[in-house]
């Protein structure tokens, strides 16, 4: 059988293509999970004076939760209510964080928070909180940056990270998706 010089090149080329294809496929088999700071890049920013809760109720709440001021971020305001996101340390690992959402309703002189008990889970990136008094109630949601939501009456996007339920008789849920196509659902608390 006759040997041609290009046959050696073809063998090398086929091997190279096979190796590169395997490396390329290995890179596509799974993408790393999003982190809390990817979903909430506000935590990569330096804290400012605006990040300090402005009423005693929310300051006390942050202190009770043992959250250092450097881990609290103001994320929006709507109708006299301020919203804050906080990062706390996980009970299970120093490398993991729990995400909390604080509502400081000045008009009703009440504050409340919602925290996950488990480390941040990118498949469940939304936090919901509701505070109320005899004077009224506020229900809101903390959502990741760049979330795309459907529009619906009774739901108001107060900032990049905050959606407020403005009408308690609005549809019961609002759906959306994150840039990586993770679907999210905001569900109204009833009762």
Segments from the language model and where they lie:
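Bacterial N-terminal signal peptides that target proteins for export
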Residues: 2-15
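Extracellularly exposed regions in secreted/surface proteins, prominently low-complexity, repeat-rich
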Residues: 141-191
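Extracytoplasmic low-complexity, Pro/Thr/Ser/Ala/Gly-rich segments
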Residues: 29-98, 181-191
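Mature extracytoplasmic domains of secretory-pathway proteins
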Residues: 73-150
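Repetitive helical segments and hydrophobic/amphipathic motifs
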Residues: 17-20
